Amino acid sequence: MNGVEGNNELSLANTTTPSHASEDLDLKQDQGLQEETDTVREMEAAGEAGADGGASPDSEHCGPELCFRVAENSCAAAARGLEDAPSPSKGGDAPSAPVAADDSSKNGCQLEGPHSPAKPKALEACGAVGLGSQQMPGPKKTKEMTTTKCAISVATGKEGEAGAAMQEKKGLQKEKKVAGGGKEETRPRAPKINCMDSLEAIDQELSNVNAQADRAFLQLERKFGRMRRLHMQRRSFIIQNIPGFWVTAFRNHPQLSPMISGQDEDMMRYMINLEVEELKQPRVGCKFKFIFQSNPYFRNEGLVKEYERRSSGRVVSLSTPIRWHRGQEPQAHIHRNREGNTIPSFFNWFSDHSLLEFDRIAEIIKGELWSNPLQYYLMGDGPRRGVRVPPRQPVESPRSFRFQSG
């Protein structure tokens, strides 16, 4: 045994209490241990009941720490009792040292000197005895574990609250989107600017195409107009050498025949040519020109009937005055049809500009007779020739012209 241990034993022997003090200390320690044991058992029973009944995890984890504190308090009380006991005399109290040592060993506390480094070990041993057969970690580890578990529990609770807040926020955003979508659906949408630009571009393209078509039509009209004039000139030259060609064509036309009297037929036998000319800019209209040989009825070699469209849109008719020989005027001869009704002379068409029937004469001559005179000339000789040419349908011109005298 070294010197330090000897000194410790000596000091322990010197601090032992007398026999009656030792008995009182033992009684107090027994009562304290009994109370602490009962408290630990109640806490254990409460922990088991909490585990069975769904107690919180925090209370279950904190139970061992409380038990350790109870045991630590009992050892501390024992140590204080030894320190507070009156110091005995050096002489007669030495034999009671073993008794105190035995009592201390019963309580599981090996007490040493007040400044001895073995005091924490004694407290640790007392904690082990207080907890019974359970071997718990040291106080620091137990506190760290308890603090960690409590922190995890608090963090878990905070995460749950944060998740609930996020879910509620998402729900509010969805409701706002749904409400906003309903408002957008009910609101009428204005046409996009891009669509209007596209429509304007298409309209401009159509205008360009129409302008190109007009220019192309004018070019084709001039081209084929020249070709037609060449054929018309050749046709007119041939017709002039056929006696009574035009009077026969007029008489064979179903609509013009009722308008021609016997005297009109005699005057039209001197007719050698018919020309129809369309007027261009700046004058718009149509001109009819009848060419006659010398005859006993009038002095004119040509009679002209002209229709012109004015800037106001009204169509007016103009004609050449007929210079009649004396006593050959149409008014001097009264013509009646089979029903006894008076028939106006065909040549009144050149002088009278008020009758709508005369406007109809201009349309028939331009659209049917002049375009295909051979068809009507051959209508009377059809059975003899064995050929009947179907009437040619007039082609509608883009610049439609309707005759109306005024």
Curated annotation (Swiss-Prot):
Residues 93-102 have a biased composition (Low complexity). One of its GO terms (biological process) is nucleosome assembly. Residues 167-188 have a biased composition (Basic and acidic residues). Residues 8-20 have a biased composition (Polar residues). It comes from the Eukaryota. Residues 1-63, 81-121, 161-189, 387-406 are annotated as: Disordered. One of its GO terms (cellular component) is nucleus. Belongs to the nucleosome assembly protein (NAP) family. PANTHER family: TESTIS-SPECIFIC Y-ENCODED PROTEIN (PTHR11875). This is Testis-specific Y-encoded-like protein 4. It comes from Mus musculus. The lineage of its organism: Eukaryota, Metazoa, Chordata, Craniata, Vertebrata.
